[in-house]
Amino acid sequence: MTTNYIFVTGGVVSSLGKGIAAASLAAILEARGLNVSMMKLDPYINVDPGTMSPIQHGEVFVTEDGAETDLDLGHYERFIRTKMSRRNNFTTGRIYSDVLRKERRGDYLGATVQVIPHITNAIKERILEGGEGHDVVLVEIGGTVGDIESLPFLEAIRQLAVDVGREHTMFMHLTLVPYMAAAGEVKTKPTQHSVKELLSIGIQPDVLICRSDRAIPANERAKIALFCNVPEKAVISLKDVDSIYKIPGLLKSQGLDEFICKRFNLACPAADLSEWEQVIFEEANPAGEVTIGMVGKYVELPDAYKSVIEALKHGGLKNRVSVNIKLIDSQNVETKGTEILKDLDAILVPGGFGYRGIEGKIATARYARENNIPYLGICLGMQVALMEFARNVAGMEDANSTEFMPDCKYPVVALITEWRDEEGNVEMRSEDSDLGGTMRLGGQQCNLVDGTLARQLYGAPSIVERHRHRYEVNNMLLKPIEAAGLRVSGRSADHSLVEIIELPNHPWFVASQFHPEFTSTPRDGHPLFSGFVKAAAEYQKRQVK
């Protein structure tokens, strides 16, 4: 089977939505019965985004096999059924690291190592490796055409089109077509110049996705086609929409999938978008609204919690309610008190690292527990719930995590010192170990306890969820906490690690060490988020009474 590649680039400005557009196209092709995958190539020099600031880069999306990747891979998994892996995302830093390691080993036999051919060859090898076994692979190139950082990637895909054959490759370019209010018309010149930039490095786009705040008139599309040397039917108008889940239908209505299938000579049935139509209907017709407060450390950039925000919306879809998400800085809880948590139907505390704002999160968990407000804790959100309960219910006044207070009297959360790496080898780590790539990562089995809320929500005795953390519940101090009323409702397969906890005497209080948001999708939702939003709606009804 020959894999077909669609290379997706962006021009004029950044943040055009290449990832969403590419994922939407992938969803249509998948709906035609094709085996589709996606890749993201990031031009930054970091080896991966694992140690990058969430406020700068946004969230780190964790794949099933434990790769720390760009948040666009989250979009990919929410739009198509194919699960991403470490093969689906790589950076300039990763490529250079691999090439330099080979150079030190002598793999290049004394040759002068250069961007061309060594770096470009390494990029091509990874693209081909990631594309194995699929009918179509969409490869998104990060950054904007014209950026110096992107040049090796653009050169690599230019070469790959020759290597694989133009009959199996396609270049799709996203551009901005701005509307000038003073002139009362859209302007195509930025698109023309962006295509000219692509042509200067040897790439002729086959499809142009033209982003605008309105539909682009037919005469302007014809003008773009003429000056950019593409068929008029391959100039796609992609206007702003109120829901990203409308984009697959918008692209399909303009025949983009049909154009691609003919280009690749793929015989497949018409796309069935009924699942997406159902998602759009549920989103547009809520029976109510709930307000959920998310108390975090990186709230100035909502993309730092992208998957959590999307998972809450998915929970709303499954309960036919609109979810109003109120982002609250945990430091404000410390300075202003829990008054700012009033008028919420539920509270979620997501993951995070470092001491800043931690006492605000602990106060938030206490407020939810004492006021019977539905609470969902994720990763650090579970740890603060445990610390709060230990301090205020189990009588461990100094309870803390060794991440924040190494010498505390009751280290109820502590560093795991014995780990297994990707190959299964035992490795010892400490607080001084490298930060990058040294966490418990990826899908891990969790066995749920019968009779618990977690078991009821999942409807299965065993689950697999994704992790990203270094610290775990300290089993040595767990007995008095359980005796005080906290219940461990799920443990790792070897029973050594606490994965999920709950409070049986609370209407809905669940916290997990894993990240359930990474496996939530608009079509399927996720048991924890669906149950959490349902609990928020029930809490709201009780308050009205």
From Swiss-Prot:
One Gene Ontology BP term is: 'de novo' CTP biosynthetic process
Report residues binding Mg(2+). Answer: 72, 140
Q: Which residues bind UTP?
A: 14, 187-192, 223
Q: Please give the InterPro entries that the UniProt record associates with this protein.
A: Class_I_gatase-like, CTP_synthase, CTP_synthase_N, GATASE, GATase1_CTP_Synthase, P-loop_NTPase
Identify the keywords attached in UniProt to this record, alphabetized: ATP-binding, Glutamine amidotransferase, Ligase, Magnesium, Metal-binding, Nucleotide-binding, Pyrimidine biosynthesis
**Glutamine amidotransferase type-1 domain sequence ranges:** 291-542
Quaternary assembly: Homotetramer.
What's the stated role of this polypeptide?
Catalyzes the ATP-dependent amination of UTP to CTP with either L-glutamine or ammonia as the source of nitrogen. Regulates intracellular CTP levels through interactions with the four ribonucleotide triphosphates.
Q: What is this protein called?
A: CTP synthase
Q: Which gene encodes it?
A: pyrG
